[in-house]
Amino acid sequence: TTPQGIRKQKEELVDILDKLKAANFNTVLFQTRTRGDVLYPSSIEPFNSILTGKVGGNPGYDPLAFAIGECHKRGMECHAWMVTIPLGNKKHVASLGKQSVTKRVKDICVPYKNEYFLNPGHPATKEYLMRLVREVVERYDIDGVHFDYLRYPENAPLFPDKYDFRRYSKGRTLDQWRRDNISEIVRYIYKGVKAMKPWVKVSTCPVGKYRDTSRYSSRGWNAFYTVYQDPQGWLGEGIQ
């Protein structure tokens, strides 16, 4: 990345933040992890290619630190927005090469419908995600962390987790086990963040429809049954 390129990237972000401030926004979700790659210097995953045109390419500055500083200058909170379970399609994963989590921590990754995903049913998945979260929360003056795609993929009935289900389900149905897997990741990360910095907010982006009601059908697209999220349960437990 050239000095001119760095300056342009920073100017574009500053322009966005100025517009948000003028519109009275008080919180910015800055994308920090995409699909197995990141937008800050990490010891765990490579830089996203959007910054330099090359996977793992150092942009010459720390985009997350810059974003946090500029948000705070404007009196706005900055939350690290992290995509969690999906790792991208086969082409994207191949572009990461040996730096991909699918190569480094194979046991927690599964291919499904031409894409790769972290496996919520593997106990080490929450540990891996917590390593990424810890890296961000410990190193940066972040105000919150926000989790996207913390769920099973669409059309998940055939998701390849039979081995883990047999090993870890302990008598639960497949639906309940999967739902518990997602809730355990939420719980584990929430408690981990609060143990490090109690003031850092933890939020998740669930599917907008919780489940069907007697009057309204979700037409097969809801949090509880389709992708195994239980946001009402999270709120009731106080882990959101």
What is the role of each PLM region?
Residues 4-23, 50-74, 180-191:
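Aromatic- and glycine-enriched glycan-recognition loops and surfaces
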Residues 40-52, 86-113, 150-170, 215-222:
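Aromatic- and acidic-residue-enriched segments that line the glycan-binding/catalytic groove
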Residues 1-7, 45-61, 112-130, 170-182, ...:
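The substrate-binding groove and active-site-proximal loops of carbohydrate-active enzymes
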Residues 23-59:
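Aromatic-lined carbohydrate-binding/catalytic grooves of carbohydrate-active enzymes
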Residues 124-134, 138-240:
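Active-site neighborhood of glycoside hydrolase catalytic domains
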Residues 25-33, 60-110, 146-149, 186-203:
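Glycine-rich, aromatic-flanked loop segments that form ligand/cofactor-binding clefts
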Residues 1-11, 68-69, 79-139, 226-229, ...:
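Active-site-adjacent "subsite" loops/lids of carbohydrate-active enzymes
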Residues 11-38, 139-144, 233, 237-240:
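Catalytic domains of carbohydrate-active enzymes, especially glycoside hydrolases
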